[in-house]
Structures are given as C-alpha cells and as structure tokens.
Amino acid sequence: MTVTNDPVVLMKQEVGKAAAQRVHSDTIIGLGTGSTTAYAIQYIGERIQTGELKNVVGVPTSFGAEVLARKYGVPLTTLDVIDKMDLAIDGADEVDPQKNLIKGGGAAHTREKIVDSLADVFIVVVDSGKLVDKLGSTFLLPVEVIPMAVTPVIKALEKLGGKTDLRMGVKKAGPVVTDQGNLVIDVKFDNIEDPANLEKTINNIPGVLENGLFVGVADLILVGEIIDGKPRVREIS
C-alpha cells in the first residue's frame, strides 16, 4: 500500500483491505470500479503475488478495473467463460438503510450491475459520507443512453419529474462516453420514494440501456469511518 498520512486515503485503504480479506483461494471475483475498490484490487493482487491466494480470477466491471487488475497481477476472465461469481466487490455513490444503492459516478454502472448481480455475495465498499436516508439525496442518478435516443430519453425522464443533465467529460472535450460507446444522462429526483419501481420505469424507456439504481443486490456494506483520527471499518448486513 502507498504510505500516506491522509485520514481519508487511510480509510479507503482499510475498507479496501477489509473487502480483499474476504477473498479466498479457488474463487471467481467481480472487480468493481472506483477509488475505494481500487485499493481492494491492489490488495488482492498483493495477496496473489505472495502466494497467500491461489487460483483466483477476476471479472472487471470497466476498462479501468481491467487496467488495475493487470497492473497488480490479478488474472482475468470474462462472462463468455463463466456464468457466475463467488464474490463481487464494488463501490457506491449512495447507500440507503435497505442497502439499496446509486452507482455510476464512474459511468460503469451497466457493467457493474451485470457483474454484481451474478455474484453469490456482493460486498459494497464506501465511506460513511455515502450513507443516506433516501437515495437521490446527495447524488444524481446516472442513466446510460444510446446516442441517438438522448433527446427523447431526456424528455421522458423529465416527465417522471427528473431534472436532467448530459454528463460532460473532464479534461476532454464533449460528453462522457461509456465503455459501451453510449452517453450518460445524470438525473436529479427530489425524492426517490420507491427505488425498485423507478429502476424498472426508467429501464423501460426506449433508448435506455441501464440506470444506476441497484435495488436488492447488495449483501454486505463495509463502511469506512474516521474515529478519533483513525480509520475504522463498520459492517452493515
């Protein structure tokens, strides 16, 4: 692990390590996307390189996760070869008391949902700032859309009461493009009272590939906290 005194970084490292410790030999694991999950991938790789873990292969949820896995020596496979995973580790942008999630800050939520839903156990790694009473409180809901359907999808989302914004790139001109070659519309809903119903309703809009609501998928939440200046990990099951 990188040596640092930053308490937030230390917290992310501790949560990533706690998740990585739940990986056992002879397993297939889903490798999520995000800054906290990156530490889990790093630590899994270190355990593989030291021989502590054997016969472990990962399924990446994004090109970024694939790059990290290769960097740290985690062997990879694809869904063309396997049909389920023993464990998936991924982050989230919001978590409600029912363990429902909003994901997609990294525009990888479509592949994340596919991989996470195929795991026997799905572990979510977050910091305490991601815990909310209701989804949509602090984070916009990402919706992946095929390019030709952006305008009609925006109109449909606004009819549902959402305020929409086409996600633009940072350090690049133009909109964000997903690994699937699609665009992302970020939507603000004042209240998401029924996440399961909204997830289905949005996905039924023609042109929508997937949205960032993950309902009834997470099994365990590992929450990083700073207590008395030191990182701690709390479990929500």
UniProtKB/Swiss-Prot annotation:
The active site is at residue 112. One of its GO terms (cellular component) is cytosol. Pfam families: Rib_5-P_isom_A. The keyword Isomerase applies. Substrate binds at residues 33-36, 90-93, 103-106, 130. Catalyzes the reversible conversion of ribose-5-phosphate to ribulose 5-phosphate. This is Ribose-5-phosphate isomerase A.
